[in-house]
Every structure is written in structure tokens, then in C-alpha cells.
Swiss-Prot record:
Transmembrane segments: none annotated. GO terms for molecular function: acetylcholine receptor inhibitor activity; ion channel regulator activity; toxin activity. Belongs to the three-finger toxin family. Ancestral subfamily. Orphan group II sub-subfamily. Residues 1-21 form the signal peptide. Expressed by the venom gland. The lineage of its organism: Eukaryota, Metazoa, Chordata, Craniata, Vertebrata. SUPFAM superfamilies: Snake toxin-like (SSF57302). GO terms for cellular component: extracellular region. This is Probable weak neurotoxin NNAM3. The keyword Ligase does not apply. Disulfide bonds join 24-45, 27-32, 38-63, 67-78, 79-84. Binds with low affinity to muscular (alpha-1-beta-1-delta-epsilon/CHRNA1-CHRNB1-CHRND-CHRNE) and very low affinity to neuronal (alpha-7/CHRNA7) nicotinic acetylcholine receptor (nAChR).
Amino acid sequence: MKTLLLTLVVVTIVCLDLGYTLTCLICPEKYCNKVHTCLNGEKICFKKYDQRKLLGKGYIRGCADTCPKLQNRDVIFCCSTDKCNL
């Protein structure tokens, strides 16, 4: 009986989803493919850029716990699925 109980406990632990970690893109270029695993608690991917610099400079991508605030002429896109901040 103890063996059966122990087996059930082990199977339960192995099968549990012990947590999900978001992955976001991080790089300063307009076109990006560098993937980063977010820290625990960071559940937002974002892409932020200055609308005056549309030719690819001034991009910031990353993970955050909340969507960053707008400043000056920034454009910010926030999302919550893997690599959604393309």
C-alpha cells in the first residue's frame, strides 16, 4: 500500500505544471529574434519605441511585471504570450 501511495505521489508531482515562465524577445533593433526567459512575476512582454525613430533605432523590448508607462513620443505595445513582442 505504501508503494502504491508513493508511486501516486511521484506521478502527481511529475505531471503537475509547476509554473509557467514567459519568453519575450529582447533586442534594440527593429527586427528581432533574441529570446529571453522572463523572471518569475514578469508576465508582460513589451515593445517600446520612439515614433520619431521609425527606421529601427530606439527600440526596446523585454519582460515586465506591468506594461511600461508612455513617455514623450513613445509607442508601447504590451502582450502576454510567448514571443508576442515581435
